[in-house]
Design a protein with these regions (language model features):
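Structured, active/binding-site neighborhoods that engage oxygen-rich ligands
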Residues: 1-134
């Protein structure tokens, strides 16, 4: 794994762990953070990340194992994350968006990795693809 790839994952994890404290809060409704403090709506410990990072790690793991993009392998890892807490900072899936849940349920029913819905937070979950390919 390249240093750039590893660095992108560390950056995502740090940003996600920092941001979880303020998750679901509107701008201007909180005092800006100057340190990582944990807490937030999920009561996470300092340094723990959310489902967004868990999914990014699933994608990174799939890209490395498959030596490129494999939609079925990727979504199977997302299902493991959702059902078993795979790559979760807590060992369980404590949050998942409705669009993601719907896509995973569709996949379990159809076995078609492209049968899901569109998640508006997708961009934050695919940063590993261009870095992996570079």
């Amino acid at each position: 794994m390249s240093e750039r790839y590893r660095g992108s994952l560390f950056g995502l994890a740090i940003g996600d762990a920092l941001g979880t404290t303020l998750e679901f809060k509107s701008p201007g409704t909180f005092t800006p953070l100057t340190d990582m403090i944990g807490g937030g709506p999920f009561g996470l410990a300092v340094g723990q990340w959310t489902d967004d990072m868990s999914m990014a790690l699933c994608l990174a793991e799939s890209l490395i194992k498959c030596q490129g993009f494999d939609a079925k392998d990727q979504i199977e890892r997302y299902v493991r994350c959702w059902r078993d807490g795979h790559l979760s900072s807590t060992g369980t899936c404590f949050d998942i968006g409705n669009a993601v849940r719907g896509a995973l349920l569709n996949f379990q029913r159809t076995r078609d990795p492209y049968s899901g819905s569109i998640d508006p937070n997708t961009a934050g979950k695919v940063a590993e693809i261009p870095i992996f390919e570079s």
